A protein has these predicted regions:
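Generic signature of intrinsically disordered, low-complexity, basic-rich segments
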Residues: 17-21, 64, 147, 156, ...
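Structured loops at beta-to-helix junctions and adjacent beta-edge loops in soluble globular domains
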Residues: 69-72, 118-120, 158-167, 249-251, ...
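Internal, well-ordered alpha/beta segment that forms a basic, Gly-enriched binding/recognition surface
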Residues: 97, 103-188
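An N-terminal structural lobe/cap that precedes and organizes the functional/catalytic core
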Residues: 5, 10-20, 25-140
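Intrinsically disordered, low-complexity boundary segments flanking structured domains
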Residues: 65-70, 144-145, 242-244
């Protein structure tokens, strides 16, 4: 499949299922599968093939078990997993730098971890992190060439792991540092829907379970070429929980994904992508990520994402139902809120020769501002001041 445009790749839709070749089933001896009372599926060694929603919430969402296998820290050794992979922290010198949490407070990247056992952490490193770390060193061209040959599943799972870890971490972080405002955690304050994370958790564990993933179980996924600009920024990460969307930039390559749209929000975003004729800036990248989230929350219907089992054959597959890609009436006030949140650390830094900082922020809140196109609808290719 050819890229949608020379600087972007778009996920294809086709038959499945597909799996990540190297899985935790490195010992390929078949194991008898059974279903537990809570609806989970386990093999005869007790390994969890599928976490029921009840078990996921109890052990992973609200518990302290390994987020991959569900083992308790009282039973096996843990060394925990960095939310942002350690090789990214090393490559971009982020260990002693801080990220901004949804509550506006900061946390150092090297302390931003989630519970993970030693075995699963090692497996994830071998199967996911090390290959993708090596691949991304080659930048956009190498990543795009690899995707053309191998497809998107490995990259999609990797980005999904980042999103999952980020929001599992939110269940442990206080929403308010001022105790007078209560002791709720960020996940409680923002009313996280564990069902959404449960589906993603099931999918991204495929490297450890051998689960087959049909392409209709995947959402929108884009690889974007990013140009260097005056900001000097080479790493960027952000996500929007309720729209199940995420963006990650590593040098000149960036990834944008939406996990629950069945690819339909991406179909509408393609109308803008077709007008982009070069690499994007860091600001334009954030707008694209926001636009994907905005379109996703305006889809008329979302696919049902489900697991299918054959316990006798020890097979687990994930599929998504087909829904017609349709949008409800677009509410640009929602776009304004999303844009304001995504750009909250950039106000005062992005300049326009026509408006003051305050006027431009007001335009962003209004939901109609764009960094992608000029007044004539042409793509803005350089770092000239915004019109």
């Amino acid at each position: 499949m050819k890229p949608v445009c020379p600087n972007m790749s778009w996920s294809s839709r086709g038959p499945g299922p597909y799996g990540i070749a190297a899985t935790a089933t490195e010992n390929s001896e078949p194991r008898m599968w059974t279903r537990t009372e809570d609806g989970s599926v386990v093999d005869d060694t007790g390994k969890v093939i599928y976490f029921s929603l009840e078990r996921f919430v109890r052990d992973i969402g609200l518990g302290d078990c390994c987020f991959i296998c569900g083992a308790s820290p009282s039973d096996v050794p843990f060394n925990n997993e960095h939310v942002i992979p350690e090789w990214i922290l090393r490559r971009f010198g982020l260990f002693d730098r801080s990220l901004t949490l949804p509550n506006g407070t900061s946390m150092r990247y090297d302390r931003y971890t989630v519970p993970c056992c030693v075995v699963c952490n090692g497996l994830m490193g071998r199967v996911i992190e090390q290959p993708i770390g090596a691949l991304t060193e080659g930048g956009y061209d190498a990543v795009n060439a690899w995707r053309e040959q191998h497809g998107i599943l490995n990259l999609y799972v990797w980005i999904g792991l980042l999103f999952l870890k980020t929001h599992l971490k939110d269940r442990t972080l206080r929403a308010h540092l001022d105790a007078r405002k209560g002791h709720a955690r960020i996940a409680e304050e923002l009313q996280y829907d564990w069902g959404g994370l449960h589906y993603l958790h099931t999918l991204v564990r495929c490297f450890a379970t051998g689960t087959g993933i049909h392409t209709d179980a995947l959402g929108s996924f884009f690889i974007v070429k990013v140009r260097g600009d005056a900001s000097g920024q080479v790493f960027d990460y952000g996500d929007l929980y309720h729209s199940q969307s995420v963006m990650l930039r590593l040098g000149d390559v960036a990834f944008i994904a939406c996990f629950n749209d069945g690819g339909n929000a991406g179909l509408f975003l393609k109308q803008k992508l077709d007008r982009i004729t070069g690499a994007v800036s860091d600001v334009q990248l954030r707008e694209l990520a926001t636009e994907l989230a905005f379109l996703n929350v305006h889809l008329k219907d979302h696919p049902k994402l489900q697991s299918y089992f054959d316990l006798e054959l020890e097979r687990h597959e994930m599929r998504g139902s087909f829904v017609m890609p349709e949008l409800v009436d677009l509410d640009y006030a929602i776009r304004g809120k999303l844009m304001h949140y995504v750009f909250r650390d950039m106000f005062g830094k992005v300049k326009s020769y026509r408006w003051t900082d305050q006027e431009f922020e007001a335009m962003v809140v209004g939901g109609r501002a764009t960094f992608l196109f000029d007044d004539h609808g042409a793509f803005i290719k350089d770092d000239a001041p915004l019109p």
